[in-house]
């Protein structure tokens, strides 16, 4: 089990093509603060191949079929359904 499973579950349940969340909302779902790197580096939000990564945070959005599009200045991330 990953600390990012609640985020994955939220995305699995989402019926729309995209979901915009404040970083604070993501933190509420996972029950803890995001790492500093999520606030400082777009790379933390990388859309890695779920078959080739060990990064549990990336798996939270790639396994349900989303791409993360962060806006670090606004402290938001938009998850867009791939396809």
Question: Over which residues does each language-model region extend?
Answer:
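Ser/Thr/Pro-rich, acidic low-complexity intrinsically disordered regulatory segments
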Residues: 1-19, 34-83
């Amino acid at each position: 089990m990953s600390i990012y499973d609640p985020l994955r579950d939220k995305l699995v349940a989402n019926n729309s093509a995209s979901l915009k969340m404040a970083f604070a909302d993501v933190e509420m779902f996972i029950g803890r603060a995001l790492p500093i790197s999520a606030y400082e580096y777009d790379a933390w939000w990388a859309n890695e191949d779920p078959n080739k990564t060990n990064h549990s945070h990336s798996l939270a959005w790639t396994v349900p079929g989303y791409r993360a599009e962060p806006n670090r200045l606004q402290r938001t991330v938009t998850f867009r359904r791939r396809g």
